[in-house]
Amino acid sequence: MKKVIFALLILGTVQVQADVAVSNIWSALPGKGSELVQNVMEARAIHEKMGAEVTLFVDHENNIHYVTGFSDWGAWGKFLDSAPNNKEWQEFWQRASEGGAAELSNTFMLEAPVSAKSQPVHMVFSWDVQQGKTPEFLALCQQSKVIHERLGASVGMNVDELANVHYEMSFESWAAYGEFSQKLAADSEWQKFFTAANAQPTAELVKVWRLSRM
């Protein structure tokens, strides 16, 4: 299980009151896909009763992204503190652990200074940002957001515990994403921005997630 180290993030000039989330990415063991789906559905029902906002996605590799959202880190802490004393959760967790349906492949603790609209299709571009360059990179993201939303995307920005940025775009359907991609490729404003941003890059694209809401 991947260990997570939480660090407070300073977002510079683009900092606003941010929602927070923890995203756990689960990979089903062979032949256990249906059991994993059943488990996350049951976990969601319990966690929502405990006060979390839960969203589920399946990615292009058939991993499940189990996202718990909170108004702030204080609310997250209260949720975490309540888990050991929640009988329903403890009984479920023991049963699910013994069943061994999946492995936790990654965990991200995120702040969202800007949130994308909740829609059936989400694209997430994960950027490894150079140390100390997160505010500068977020400023670039704000500029690209204007272009992408003009072309039909809803854009969000998520900053993880290592100050890396996950740039999110959501759409009504995969067809809508395809139409967006065609328009983007032909957009002169985007081409000019993209060329300028890559002249002195401050981040490296390390992962692209194609997510469908469950």
Predicted regions and their residues:
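Generic cytosolic/nucleocytoplasmic N-terminal low-complexity/intrinsically disordered segments
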Residues: M1-K2, V206
